[in-house]
Amino acid sequence: MSIILGIDPGSRVTGYGVVRQVGHKLEYLGSGVIRTSIDDLPTRLKRIYAGITEIITQFNPNEFAIEQVFMAKNPDSALKLGQARGTAIVAAVNQNLPVFEYSPRTIKQTVVGTGAAEKSQVQEMVVRLLQLSDKPQVDAADALAIAITHANSIHNSLQIANSIAIKTPDKITALLRTKYRRGRLRLKG
């Protein structure tokens, strides 16, 4: 069983989504947004850090997944997004959580089936996959999609590791030597 915290970073609105993975099944635990005021950037980053730390304390996740930075048209926006993302990662690392990163295209591909999906399509698929009665806010839905992507990545990686261990009995411990980096499976040895 894993509890996964997904984060959709933003300097004004940061989405979060928490799911529990038991085998092949995902269970919705919670989601929402951390809104910051129009204060200066350091104050907003402080609020993001405090909010994520509070969420980690409340849900006690085992793993932390976050969206990678994409190239924005406005360089200033990209820098602020990167700072918000860094703040979120520091909050997770300070709570000893492993951090996994996924590109926006990978998240859309995993949840919707196409890397060019619209936000509304992601939101609708999150509702279906987690059997939610109401649509979450867009940023919260994105965060849940990130958590779903990570859960899917874990499941697929463990299947691959099991396959390797079965096909090579002399390396049966391959599963135990599995390491994840940036959401990708790496085998040591």
From Swiss-Prot:
Catalytic activity: Endonucleolytic cleavage at a junction such as a reciprocal single-stranded crossover between two homologous DNA duplexes (Holliday junction)
Entry EC no(s): 3.1.21.10
Active-site residues from the entry: 8, 67, 139
Pfam families membership: RuvC
Entry keywords, A to Z: Cytoplasm, DNA damage, DNA recombination, DNA repair, DNA-binding, Endonuclease, Hydrolase, Magnesium, Metal-binding, Nuclease
Main subcellular location of this protein, as a coarse class: cytoplasm
Residue runs in coiled coils: none
CDD domains xref list: RuvC
Gene Ontology terms for molecular function: crossover junction DNA endonuclease activity; DNA binding; magnesium ion binding
Cofactor: Mg(2+)
One biological process term in Gene Ontology: DNA recombination
Key word Glycoprotein present: no
Highest taxon, organism lineage: Bacteria
SUPFAM superfamilies cross-referenced by the UniProt entry: Ribonuclease H-like
Residues binding Mg(2+) 2, per UniProt: 67
Presence of keyword Hydrolase: yes
Protein location: Cytoplasm
Cofactor note: Binds 2 Mg(2+) ion per subunit.
This protein's GO CC annotations: cytoplasm; Holliday junction resolvase complex
Binding site for Mg(2+) 1: 8, 139
Record-stated family: Belongs to the RuvC family.
Subunit structure, as described in the record: Homodimer which binds Holliday junction (HJ) DNA. The HJ becomes 2-fold symmetrical on binding to RuvC with unstacked arms; it has a different conformation from HJ DNA in complex with RuvA. In the full resolvosome a probable DNA-RuvA(4)-RuvB(12)-RuvC(2) complex forms which resolves the HJ.
Purpose: The RuvA-RuvB-RuvC complex processes Holliday junction (HJ) DNA during genetic recombination and DNA repair. Endonuclease that resolves HJ intermediates. Cleaves cruciform DNA by making single-stranded nicks across the HJ at symmetrical positions within the homologous arms, yielding a 5'-phosphate and a 3'-hydroxyl group; requires a central core of homology in the junction. The consensus cleavage sequence is 5'-(A/T)TT(C/G)-3'. Cleavage occurs on the 3'-side of the TT dinucleotide at the point of strand exchange.
NCBIfam families reported for this sequence: ruvC
Protein name as annotated: Crossover junction endodeoxyribonuclease RuvC
Organism: Histophilus somni (strain 129Pt)
High-level lineage: Bacteria, Pseudomonadati, Pseudomonadota, Gammaproteobacteria, Pasteurellales
